[in-house]
């Protein structure tokens, strides 16, 4: 097995990475940061997002696994004190993997530039600096509403527990092959009206946000900020690609949710 390790800049994560590398080498597991079969992130969820974007060109060939050293690790199955057990599992057990949906993001421009294409594991947002964003929301090429407010968030099921949850979106089980549109501080009064509720969109449907002409929009894809001029619209759908997580031990999704947000009684 060939393994790549991605860690954050925290000293604890660097120490854990050093220990993990030693254990892997002692067990004849090859470190390969170019063509790995397994990518191990050491840190928190942000580190795993970084690992995903670093290796998302190899999604059909790699699985991901997280070692938790931070304050919140929704994607991380292993703790930093379980390294020996983790390496033993890599050596003994045949890997099983669980796959989750990803978000296909396509930015279209007014000036004829080629579309820009991205994959998101958690979410993508559209905002407009310090001014009110105005955008027409199309579902399957039909106008659904005209949105006015701070912005829009479009999230995957696994991303539903991240930024989406903090702005009032629903938590979706990752087995649901769909994505979610959640408003960010929408304007709703007698003149301007939106649905005002999160919308769950099936994988067979697609979403396009057509923006009023302006040069101060910015789009995020997970932790990446993408500032672009002349954006005409942003299109979203469930991607053909999926992310695979190595599953050497099972943790029920709702147990993860409880552990991350509620804790023990």
From Swiss-Prot:
PANTHER family: NAD KINASE
Protein name, entry field: NAD kinase
UniProt source species: Enterococcus faecalis (strain ATCC 700802 / V583)
Keywords: ATP-binding, Cytoplasm, Kinase, NAD, NADP, Nucleotide-binding, Transferase
Cofactor(s) needed by this chain: a divalent metal cation
Residues given in the record as NAD(+) binding sites: 45-46, 122-123, 148, 150, 161-166, 185, 223
Reactions it catalyzes: NAD(+) + ATP = ADP + NADP(+) + H(+)
Family indicated by similarity: Belongs to the NAD kinase family.
UniProt-listed Enzyme Commission number(s): 2.7.1.23
GO process annotations (BP): NAD metabolic process; NADP biosynthetic process
Signal peptide: none
Summary of the function given for this chain in its UniProt record: Involved in the regulation of the intracellular balance of NAD and NADP, and is a key enzyme in the biosynthesis of NADP. Catalyzes specifically the phosphorylation on 2'-hydroxyl of the adenosine moiety of NAD to yield NADP.
